[in-house]
């Protein structure tokens, strides 16, 4: 089952465009052989050359050896877990923290169903979904930045 928008052939504007040949892909240059034989290998080899050059010129240091008997002062998760880590760190009740963690994917699952009756794909014509996305992004950035700060400055980011 695919979700594709079918064109409304009764629309006079669309019929006028199709009559002029604007609805078909007759413009531009073909992907074969121009892109696939000449441009893509140059881009791939250039990317490999940049990676090898960076690896040779700026090798990453191994760092200090691990000491199993010394625990670091603060253990931080990977960067993509910072917002959820901040939720767990600031909420005093463990059950509430776990429920808030579960609400993150549950909230993400509801976003496509907001304004799903709207036929427009332009985000400016879907104000509710766009607002939910922008507020969610701002909250995730706020929590992610706050997770890197000490607990007393984490919610205000040291600004207030």
Curated annotation (Swiss-Prot):
The keyword DNA-binding does not apply. The keyword Transmembrane helix applies. GO terms for molecular function: electron transporter, transferring electrons within cytochrome b6/f complex of photosystem II activity; electron transporter, transferring electrons within the cyclic electron transport pathway of photosynthesis activity; oxidoreductase activity. GO terms for biological process: photosynthetic electron transport chain. InterPro entries: Cyt_b/b6_C, Cyt_b/b6_C_sf, Cyt_b6/f_cplx_suIV, Cytochrome_b_C_euk/bac. Keywords: Chloroplast, Electron transport, Membrane, Photosynthesis, Plastid, Thylakoid, Transmembrane, Transmembrane helix, Transport. The chain crosses the membrane at residues 36-56, 95-115, 131-151. It comes from the Eukaryota. Disulfide bonds: none annotated. One of its GO terms (cellular component) is chloroplast thylakoid membrane. It is found in: Plastid, Chloroplast thylakoid membrane. Its main location: plastid. Pfam families: Cytochrom_B_C. It is a multi-pass membrane protein. The 4 large subunits of the cytochrome b6-f complex are cytochrome b6, subunit IV (17 kDa polypeptide, petD), cytochrome f and the Rieske protein, while the 4 small subunits are petG, petL, petM and petN. The complex functions as a dimer. Component of the cytochrome b6-f complex, which mediates electron transfer between photosystem II (PSII) and photosystem I (PSI), cyclic electron flow around PSI, and state transitions. HAMAP family: Cytb6_f_subIV. Belongs to the cytochrome b family. PetD subfamily. This is Cytochrome b6-f complex subunit 4. The gene is petD.
């Amino acid at each position: 089952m695919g979700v594709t928008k079918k064109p409304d052939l009764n629309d006079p504007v669309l019929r006028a465009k199709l009559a002029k040949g604007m609805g078909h892909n007759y413009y531009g240059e073909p992907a074969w052989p121009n892109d696939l034989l000449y441009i893509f290998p140059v881009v791939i080899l250039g990317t490999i050359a940049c990676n090898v050059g960076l690896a040779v010129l700026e090798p990453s240091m191994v760092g200090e050896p691990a000491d199993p008997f010394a625990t670091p002062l603060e253990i931080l998760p990977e960067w993509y877990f910072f917002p959820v880590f901040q939720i767990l760190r600031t909420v005093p009740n463990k059950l509430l923290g776990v429920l808030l963690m579960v609400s993150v994917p549950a909230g993400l699952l509801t976003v496509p169903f907001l304004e799903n009756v709207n036929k427009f794909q332009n985000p400016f014509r879907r104000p509710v979904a766009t607002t939910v996305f922008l507020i969610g992004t701002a909250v995730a950035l706020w929590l992610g930045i706050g997770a890197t700060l000490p607990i007393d400055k984490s919610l205000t980011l040291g600004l207030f």
